[in-house]
Amino acid sequence: MRILFIADPLEHFKIYKDTTFAMMEEAHRRGHAISFAEAHQLSVEGGRLQVDACDLAVTDERPDWYKLGPKLRQPLTAFSAVVMRKDPPFDMEYLYASQLFTLAEAQGVKVFTSGQALRDFNEKLAILHFPELISPTLISGEAHRLRAFVNQHQDVILKPLDSMGGDSIFRVKPDDPNLSVIIETITWRGKRTVMAQRYIPEIRDGDKRILVIDGVPVDHCLARIPAAGETRGNLAAGGRGEARPLSARDREIAETVGPELKKRGILLAGLDVIGNYLTEVNVTSPTCFREIMDQTGVNVAGLYIDALERRCQH
């Protein structure tokens, strides 16, 4: 197989924990040909999707873990699979890339995750498809509605719809002297829609990342435990990752969401679960492969490449 990875610049990879690197390393180990490009290197000419991509060889050297060939313009149809691994935010450039992927798919290119799914499954809003699994939630940009929600539930998390890694997340209460300015700031004075969720105290025990590959949950999750004094469990916000077997409730959530993900063509998703509640469905570039692999010995990257190979054979 020829696999094109579209991702952020390689020099930014932290390979000791990078999921895209784990995917590349496993694909390379199996003898697949790997190419790399950034999203801005996609183009359309004469109605055909093209990309300025480099062949990539994974090496055993550190820190120089890759070698790149010359940059060549080639059609996306030249690749067995295109794997989109660019990190959020899902801004206009991300939207344009997803639209180009939809055009490519119409020309027979296999894209993971599909352009349509990237557009339809906003990582914060996707949980609304599963109302029975979520804590009380409000989507709004209106200050009076957000304040009323805070007054009703007393302890609330506010977060934007387009962030990642715990960025711009606030925990607020009705008597917070900064509540008004926090609402003004996060909503851009009512010009931006945000999510409000009732605070789930089980975050103290960890915000669990459950990986779902081709509709099937990986048997271990990664509990991301907040640092002292922190509300956020995200590893990017200083949380500590601890691999754990799925609980019965974790599996129930994953097996409820998994079939819908598969139906929509989402090969890989990261479900975020706090306590008994689903809080996010990450589909752009889910992480935590490496942490689970290192702590359990389970080859999560192998499970992903297995699924990719199956999809490309059909």
UniProtKB/Swiss-Prot annotation:
Entry keyword set: ATP-binding, Glutathione biosynthesis, Ligase, Magnesium, Manganese, Metal-binding, Nucleotide-binding
GO cellular component, as recorded: cytoplasm
Protein name: Glutathione synthetase
Domain ATP-grasp residues, every copy: 122-309
GO molecular function, one term: metal ion binding
Necessary cofactors: Mg(2+); Mn(2+)
Residues reported in the UniProt entry to bind ATP: 149-206
Residue positions binding Mg(2+): 280, 282
E.C. number: 6.3.2.3
Recorded catalytic activity of this chain's protein: gamma-L-glutamyl-L-cysteine + glycine + ATP = glutathione + ADP + phosphate + H(+)
